[in-house]
Amino acid sequence: MSAEPAPHRARAQLEALTAAVADGTAGRGFSALRSAPVPTDPRAAAVLILFGILDGVPSGHAADDVSRDLDVLLLARATTLRSHPGQVAFPGGRLDEGEEPIAAALREAEEETGLDPAGVDVLGTLETLPLAFSQHLVTPVLGWWQHPSPVRVVDEAESAAVFRAPVADLLDPANRGVTVVRRDGQEWRGPAFHVPHATGIHLVWGFTAVVLDGLFDRLGWTEPWDRARELPLTVEPRPTR
């Protein structure tokens, strides 16, 4: 039996990916988002994809390429929000005037989860991605939680939960599937994840799931999973205006 990968191996892989994106050798990722229509009057936004060493119970799934105690920071948006209500997301939001994506991602993460940005090592950014549903162009910022700090729901009007999800749980084929959105005679299928948590099972779908799915593929972490398995939506999407 092979030894479990060391958790800090993931940091080296993430650093290699951001370096390849920066010098143009990473290839084109996130095809599902790149094929989507670009917003006509987009607003700039950034999200923080923050990996670290789990502070809770390690995953029960023995993933091939990541350790059981590697995690990623996620939050569940409040169900009362007008945009993406109830969805699991990365911390993040719109850029203020004159603000850069890295600064915005760290600021929003602090405002939404209470984390201390001083404990985050920013590894770099990925390609800016269109989010046509809410008219945004989003820059993912990859980070490593070198010195973790407590996180919590800071504003209940914005978030319902803040949690650190074991990456091995996300990679577990038993927790993977697709969601299907049907509207106006059209159908959109996308990757989805079930994330076990103390408060129940969270469904990760939409933009966040597409980014995680594409990121795992690019890092070589993905395990074979059933792409025909449908996971029912717990919160139906509604159009923004």
What are these regions (language model features)?
Residues 154-191, 198:
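NUDIX/MutT-family hydrolases
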Residues 1-90, 94-111, 115-142, 146-149, ...:
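N-terminal leader/linker segments that precede catalytic domains of diphosphate-processing enzymes
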